[in-house]
UniProtKB/Swiss-Prot annotation:
A Pfam family of this chain: 7tm_1
Glycosylation site positions: N159
Residues where lipid is bound covalently (S-palmitoyl cysteine): C309
Protein name: Adenosine receptor A1
Bilayer disposition of the protein: Multi-pass membrane protein
Lineage, highest ranks first: Eukaryota, Metazoa, Chordata, Craniata, Vertebrata
Main location: membrane
Cellular component, GO, one term: plasma membrane
Subcellular localization: Cell membrane
Role according to the record: Receptor for adenosine. The activity of this receptor is mediated by G proteins which inhibit adenylyl cyclase.
Transmembrane spans: 11-33, 47-69, 81-102, 124-146, 177-201, 236-259, 268-292
Gene: ADORA1
Length: 326
């Protein structure tokens, strides 16, 4: 280690480790539930499992690499670049998985009768593979030349050094801010966010429309319908809020770095923004799994079978097709 870890860095590392310790078990539990319960094998839960795989990797790989970059070891330029790229790949995979889930929820509401014929297991698998392939393309783009090597080489040569530059490995030293803002943010983060807003607004509209039809054709208590509508709306608003809260701050800071290089960015703001992006992986099991009845039942069985040594009866795979708890 080139230098001792400061108290501030130690606190950062401690928080990152805590996030990883929450993220990895939570998302492993989601994957485990899909594996053991046949009722969780349809397209919706496959998308959620794909998201969980990405989030496990965030906790098990991205966070340790982020800690390594924060310490700033002396490495060759391309070695540092290889350390930085998995962060881009896996965070992008999480974003695309969230978008796939949003599209899947829209199709469930828009074409409920034809949903199973349109969203087949084969098509769902193709969509999942497509998300990962796109994530690899986006995340590995810096390896193919869109990076800061030319700037580093100029400074390296000016000092009379030869060979591949050896640098203190830091994310912003190797990753181009033009790439992060113009390509990553403006193409692969902001548009999916806006698209999800539109999708969930349409989902809300369609649900409200259907509930209105039911209310107008029913002599029952309309409060029941409005209550369910409100709960669904709150769930969708929570999804959007957590996504925006987690990803926008760091990208806004990147925009400030690019467009106002002389502007001062408090270090604590950068750390908070990083915590939010990584913390989103720990939030996802709660948002996408713990509000689904089939997952809760499976989680309870896993807990009792493997941790309390009190086997539960077999899971009833004919649970109602309820997606969000009433």
């Amino acid at each position: 280690m080139p230098h001792s870890v400061s108290a501030f860095q130690a606190a950062y590392i401690g928080i990152e480790v805590l996030i990883a310790l929450v993220s990895v078990p939570g998302n492993v539990l989601v994957i485990w539930a899909v594996k053991v319960n046949q009722a969780l094998r349809d397209a919706t839960f496959c998308f959620i499992a794909s998201l969980a795989v990405a989030d496990v990797a965030v906790g098990a790989l991205v966070i340790p690499l982020a800690i390594l970059i924060n310490i700033g070891p002396q490495t060759y330029f391309h070695t540092c670049l290889m350390v930085a790229c998995p962060v881009l790949i896996l965070t992008q995979s999480s974003i695309l998985a969230l978008l796939a889930i949003a599209v899947d929820r829209y199709l469930r509401v828009k074409i409920p009768l034809r949903y199973k014929t349109v969203v087949t297991p084969r098509r769902a698998a193709v969509a999942i593979a497509g998300c990962w392939i796109l994530s690899l393309v986006v995340g590995l783009t810096p390896m193919f030349g869109w990076n800061n090597l030319s700037k580093i080489e100029m400074a390296w040569a000016a000092n009379g050094s030869v060979g591949e530059p050896v640098i203190k490995c830091e994310f912003e030293k190797v990753i181009s801010m033009e790439y992060m803002v113009y390509f990553n943010f403006f193409v692969w983060v902001l548009p999916p966010l806006l698209l999800m807003v539109l999708i969930y607004l349409e989902v809300f509209y369609l649900i409200r429309k259907q509930l209105s039809k039911k209310v107008s054709a029913s002599s029952g208590d309309p409060q029941k319908y409005y209550g369910k509508e409100l709960k669904i709306a709150k769930s969708l608003a929570l999804i959007l809020f957590l996504f925006a809260l987690s990803w926008l701050p760091l990208h806004i800071l990147n925009c400030i770095t690019l467009f106002c290089p002389t502007c001062h960015k408090p270090t604590i703001l950068t750390y908070i923004a990083i915590f939010l992006t990584h913390g989103n992986s720990a939030m996802n099991p709660i948002v996408y799994a713990f509000r689904i009845q089939k997952f809760r039942v499976t989680f309870l069985k896993i807990w009792n079978d493997h941790f309390r040594c009190q086997p539960e009866p077999p899971i009833d795979e004919d649970l109602p097709e309820e997606k969000v708890d009433d």
